[in-house]
Amino acid sequence: MLIQRCTQLMVELDAEPRFALESLLSGGGGLDSTPRWMAYAPHLEAPIQVSLGELKALEGISSSNPSEHNDLIREYGEQTINALLNNGLLLCDEDRHTLLRERDQVVRDVAWWPPAAIAMAQGRWKDVDIGARNERGLMMSSQEMVDAFGAAPEPEYRRQENAATVALSKPKNTAFNEILSKRKTCRNFDSDKIISAEDLATMLHRVWGAIGTLELAPGAVAVKKNSPAGGGLHATEAYVLVQRAEGLQPGIYHYLSMQHALEPLAIFSRQEMRELMYRCVAGQDWFQDVPVMVVMTARFDRLFWKYRRHTKAWRVVHLDVGHLSQTMYLSAADLGLGAFVTAAINDHAIEQALGLQTLKEGAIAIVGFGPRLPVNTTLELDNLTLLDLN
């Protein structure tokens, strides 16, 4: 059996208090603050506690030149090697590690900056249900947060408290201001209405549709859309989750931005889509009546083709999605539709539904849009105290 270390690995000395049943049973406080070494690897789902002996073995075993199992046992001991094989920090050529080797190969093939790869891989949510937590009283209200943590930092941030300010001229008021004033996050969608084919097509093209291309070199094409993107690569994909849309069956569709067309991936019943969409937005039940959601994913292999192991590239992913989200909001406001964006998503459920390969393509955020209810039943930012600039 041939063995090698995983491609990327980082360790942390963790001394955060954690629940310890042994402490509780022995009359202690139930917390353990003993420092422990935790190993993080992007091909794994969670950090692994390791001993100093296991760290020594990981230091000495190559990630590129496999070694014989028996040779490593003689050098580091059977218990150490088997423990590292069992937790996936060491990879072998047997069938039991096929999936882990495939994930590790993606880490090799896609030029991730290691800290970003670990943050992306291990920051993913699984089976989070915010609605259920609300029902059980596990979510803190604003008042409870103030009581527990003190007042939030003030919304106006000044660097010099007593310095004189420089007055600016009154801003122009054009037709664009009216659209901006209508931009808001909607939590009240009308479950009896569908989104029209025209509105859906307009939203998809305005936000994610390609306007033109420019060949920078053979094999390197930049894309122009209505929002900016790092390097002109536009590595964000749009997957449309349809619950109620004119002319479309409920299901999952991939938007082909260069063709302005939908690629059907899976067809479901309306109830199945409602349940899937609820899981995808982590149980935020105030969004479940929206007729369509769009999952925005990042194609890391495309973006990192240019920005290889770049310390800033992962930030660009989130900037791109932010630009698209604002374009979505403004387009929805123009069409008189409600809209939202959320990054509180169950990554695992999305990856399974869309068939994504972790770290090659990953979900970043979900947006949704459609007809609003005439009267709010869930809190939105209405009744604002408007600022007077006169």
Question: Could you tell me what each predicted segment is?
Answer:
Residues 274-275, 308-315:
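Short, surface-exposed loop/helix-turn segments at secondary-structure junctions
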Residues 85, 288, 333:
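Anion (oxyanion) recognition and catalysis
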